[in-house]
């Protein structure tokens, strides 16, 4: 893909990550290597027809690192050109701690790799019928969920964007909402307390260990006024960390509100 800014690159990668996650092909964790992205970058003067000399940037372990590397390399190349120096076609390694890069090796052109056709591989012919069969079997994708959450559950667009922005959130939301029948309240608990605790514990959404059943029970307890909001949040921390049954816990600890 041909892109012109760090923002455009990150938007593309985030979209690609969601597609792959929803297909179940990978969890797409850059820091663990289940998703990789190298960046080839060049600059040219405004109005110039030809691209400048490109470099390839490696060791990019997060979307934030990719954005910083793009901005850093763009600035480095512009500085070289303005000083009358040449940009060397090379592979560079990004150091996110120092927010700078250093040369690894010279970057060859395609002909230098000496590519040639593999004689033992037969041509693969993909029919329109095969494509349609694959389409029919693929799971519901993020964009489809985004619309459905607003239409079926009556969620605001903001809620739907957050919940579908990670498949783990979407799966948790749908399962819990199906149990308690309170989609907006389930959404609120995921978007506030769940995300807060994930950040505090430096966890990713796919590391959530509590069950949808226990989240649904807590939503019911809070909605019925059986526990105060303060108690509900305290109990949820136990649910988040230990996946306890909130209903049994509040009864055992005498935390039910007396009307």
Residue ranges and their predicted role:
Residues 1-259:
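Charged, compositionally biased, marginally structured helical/coil segments
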């Amino acid at each position: 893909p041909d892109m012109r800014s760090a923002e455009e690159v990150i938007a593309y990668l985030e979209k690609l990550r969601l597609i792959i996650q929803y297909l179940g092909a990978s969890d797409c964790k850059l820091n663990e290597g289940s998703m990789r992205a190298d960046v080839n970058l060049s600059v040219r003067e405004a109005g110039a027809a030809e691209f400048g000399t490109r470099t390839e940037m490696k060791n990019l372990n997060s979307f934030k690192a990719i954005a910083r590397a793009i901005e850093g390399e763009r600035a480095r190349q512009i500085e070289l050109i303005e000083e009358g120096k040449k940009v060397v076609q090379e592979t560079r390694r990004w150091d996110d701690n120092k927010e700078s890069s250093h040369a690894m090796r010279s970057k060859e052109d395609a002909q230098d790799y000496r590519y040639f056709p593999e004689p033992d591989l037969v041509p693969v012919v993909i029919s329109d019928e095969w494509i349609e069969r694959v389409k029919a079997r693929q799971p519901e994708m993020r964009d489809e969920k985004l619309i459905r959450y607003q239409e079926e559950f009556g969620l605001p667009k903001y809620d739907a964007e957050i919940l579908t922005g990670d498949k783990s959130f979407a799966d948790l939301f749908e399962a819990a909402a199906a149990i308690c029948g309170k989609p907006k309240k389930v959404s609120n608990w995921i978007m506030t307390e769940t995300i807060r605790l994930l950040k505090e514990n430096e966890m990713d959404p796919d590391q959530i260990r509590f069950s949808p059943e226990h989240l649904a029970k807590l939503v019911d307890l809070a909605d019925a006024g059986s526990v105060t909001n303060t108690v509900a949040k305290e109990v949820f921390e136990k649910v988040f960390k230990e996946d306890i049954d909130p209903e049994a816990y509040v009864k055992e600890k005498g935390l039910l509100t007396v009307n």
